[in-house]
C-alpha cells in the first residue's frame, strides 16, 4: 500500500510541476522510480529554464511541501549554455556551492544555488505577500542572474488592517446584494401575481371576444338572409313586371281585333243582283 501511495505521489508531483511551470515535453527529464527507490536523494526531475520567464516557484515549493510533508529543495545550476533546476525531495548528497539566497543571485559556470521554502519566506517583505516568482536573466559572459520577485507590504499590521477593511467592504456589499436579491424576489412575486391576474382577465376577455365573434357571425348570417330575401323580391317584381307588360300588349291586341270586328259588322254590304 505504501508503494502505491509513493507512485501516486510521484505522478502527482510530476504532473503538478509540468502544469505550474508550463513545461513542454522537451523542457524536463524525469528520474525513474527504480532509481528513486534505491536512492531517494536523487532529483525527481531536472528542468531547463527559459530566459525572462516568470516561474511560480513559491507556489510549486509549497505544493511539494504539502504533498510530501517534507522540506523539498530546488537546486539551480549554470550549465554554461542554460540554467537547470533539479527538484529534490531530500537534501542532495553533494551540494555544489553554499550561496545565501537573495533577491538577485549571480551564477557562474557550474555554480549552484539551493532554494528552500524557508529561504523564500525570509526574502518576502511579509508573510501574507503574493507568491514569489523566479526569473532567469542572462548576465555578461556566461553568467546568469537568478532573480526572485516578491510583492507585499512592508508593514504587516497595515496589511492586516487593509485585509480587514476589504473583508468588511465585501461583507457590506454582500448584505446589500442579499437585500437587493430580496427586493428583486418581492418584485418578481408581485409581477407574477399581476401576470396571473392579467391571464385570468385576458382569459375572460378571450371568452367575451369569442362570444362577440359568434354574435357577429350570427348577425352577418341574418343580414345575408335579409339581403337574399330582398334580392329574391326584386327578382320576382321584375318578373311580374315583364309578365304584366306581355299581358297588356295581348289585351290591347285583342281589343284592336274586337274593334275591327265591330266596324266591319256595322258597314252595309252591297247587293249581289240588280233591282227591277
Curated annotation (Swiss-Prot):
This protein's GO CC annotations: host cell nuclear inner membrane; membrane
Keywords: Host membrane, Host nucleus, Late protein, Membrane, Phosphoprotein, Transmembrane, Transmembrane helix
Keyword Transcription regulation: no
Keyword flag Transmembrane: yes
Regions of this protein lying in the Nuclear compartment: 265-276
Residues spanning the membrane: 246-264
Annotated membrane topology: Single-pass membrane protein
Compartments where located: Host nucleus inner membrane
PTM annotation: Phosphorylated.
Family: Belongs to the herpesviridae NEC2 protein family.
Assembly and oligomerization: Forms a heterohexameric complex with NEC1.
Name assigned to this protein: Nuclear egress protein 2
Amino acid at each position: 500500500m505504501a508503494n502505491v501511495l509513493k507512485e501516486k505521489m510521484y505522478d502527482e508531483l510530476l504532473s503538478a510541476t509540468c502544469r505550474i511551470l508550463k513545461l513542454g515535453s522537451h523542457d524536463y527529464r524525469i528520474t525513474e522510480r527504480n532509481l528513486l527507490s534505491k536512492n531517494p536523494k536523487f532529483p525527481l526531475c531536472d528542468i531547463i529554464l527559459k530566459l525572462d520567464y516568470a516561474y511560480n516557484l513559491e507556489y510549486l515549493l509549497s505544493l511539494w511541501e504539502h504533498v510530501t510533508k517534507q522540506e523539498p529543495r530546488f537546486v539551480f545550476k549554470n550549465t554554461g549554455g542554460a540554467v537547470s533546476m533539479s527538484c529534490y525531495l531530500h537534501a542532495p548528497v553533494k551540494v555544489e556551492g553554499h550561496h545565501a539566497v537573495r533577491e538577485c543571485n549571480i551564477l557562474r559556470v557550474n555554480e549552484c544555488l539551493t532554494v528552500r521554502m524557508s529561504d523564500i519566506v525570509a526574502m518576502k517583505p511579509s508573510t501574507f505577500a503574493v507568491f514569489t516568482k523566479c526569473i532567469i536573466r542572462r548576465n555578461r559572459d556566461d553568467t546568469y542572474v537568478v532573480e526572485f520577485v516578491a510583492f507585499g507590504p512592508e508593514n504587516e499590521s497595515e496589511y492586516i488592517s487593509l485585509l480587514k477593511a476589504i473583508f468588511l467592504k465585501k461583507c457590506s456589499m454582500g448584505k446589500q446584494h442579499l437585500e437587493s436579491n430580496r427586493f428583486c424576489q418581492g418584485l418578481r412575486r408581485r409581477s407574477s401575481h399581476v401576470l396571473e391576474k392579467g391571464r385570468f382577465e385576458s382569459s375572460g376577455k378571450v371568452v367575451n371576444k369569442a362570444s362577440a365573434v359568434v354574435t357577429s357571425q350570427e348577425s352577418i348570417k341574418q343580414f345575408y338572409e335579409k339581403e337574399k330575401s330582398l334580392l329574391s323580391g326584386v327578382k320576382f317584381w321584375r318578373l311580374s313586371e315583364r309578365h304584366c307588360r306581355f299581358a297588356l300588349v295581348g289585351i290591347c291586341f285583342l281589343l284592336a281585333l274586337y274593334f275591327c270586328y265591330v266596324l266591319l259588322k256595322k258597314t252595309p254590304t252591297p247587293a249581289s243582283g240588280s233591282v227591277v
